[in-house]
């Protein structure tokens, strides 16, 4: 009993360290800029990812978690230098506890194959780790709550290339600077905690399924990724 209690206390301390207890207890309204909410986990990359996943599992008073079936953390090669960020899990992802496994995921796989990539060469995650009810877009508050975990996820992975799929991922990482149609297809370098990957935004596969005429622009973005891979010798 004492051992279990001690472990719960350790888990709770790790959780508060991650989200910053002062941030949680403050009466100040939520702010958009939370770049200072970071955590450093020790150990190997795999150990760090496991600790991060555990911290997300410890989240409380979250409607996303309450209504979801499973935590959807990440998928792919943890040694990959290419990381892809989507919006949030759908029904199939929630059921299988894996990102991009539904129809949009199948399209993403085809998009990756077109530039000679697959899930053994990339790592995939989402802005939020639990499925929003009815597949709705995550709210601003939900994005703000999960953003420290996402940024720490990116820090641990330390990708050379970061691909943001859709406006939710774009606005979470870059900020509300513009719409995805204007921001896509441009390379920028941005510090995310201790790492500074090359970042490009493109359309989310789910959007491309609704607007197939935009696939020609997505193909331009994919070719830019292919060229950057060659230039960086990944």
Q: What kind of region is each of these model predictions?
A:
Residues 7-11, 15-18, 22-234:
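A polyanion-binding, active-site-adjacent surface
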Residues 1-3:
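Short, small/acidic-rich helices and loops at N termini and domain boundaries
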């Amino acid at each position: 009993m004492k051992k279990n209690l001690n472990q719960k206390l350790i888990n709770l301390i790790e959780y508060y360290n991650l989200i910053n207890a002062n941030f949680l207890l403050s009466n100040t309204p939520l702010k958009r800029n939370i770049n200072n909410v970071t955590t450093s986990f020790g150990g190997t990359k795999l150990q760090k990812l496991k600790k991060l996943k555990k911290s997300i599992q410890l989240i409380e008073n979250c409607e996303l978690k309450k209504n979801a079936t499973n935590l959807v953390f990440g998928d792919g090669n943890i040694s990959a230098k290419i990381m892809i960020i989507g919006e949030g899990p759908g029904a199939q992802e929630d059921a299988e506890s894996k990102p991009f496994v539904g129809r949009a995921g199948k399209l993403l796989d085809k998009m990756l194959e077109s530039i000679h990539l697959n899930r053994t060469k990339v790592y995939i995650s989402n802005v939020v780790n639990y499925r929003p009810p009815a597949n709705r877009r995550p709210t601003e508050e939900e994005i703000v709550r999960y953003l420290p975990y996402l940024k720490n996820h990116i820090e641990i992975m330390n990708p050379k290339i970061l691909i943001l799929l859709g406006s939710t991922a774009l606005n979470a990482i870059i900020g509300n600077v513009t719409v995805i149609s204007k921001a896509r297809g441009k390379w920028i370098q941005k510090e995310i905690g201790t790492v500074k990957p090359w970042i490009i935004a493109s359309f989310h596969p789910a959007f491309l399924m609704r607007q197939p005429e935009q696939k020609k622009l997505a193909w331009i973005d994919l070719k830019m990724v292919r060229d950057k891979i060659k230039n960086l010798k990944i």
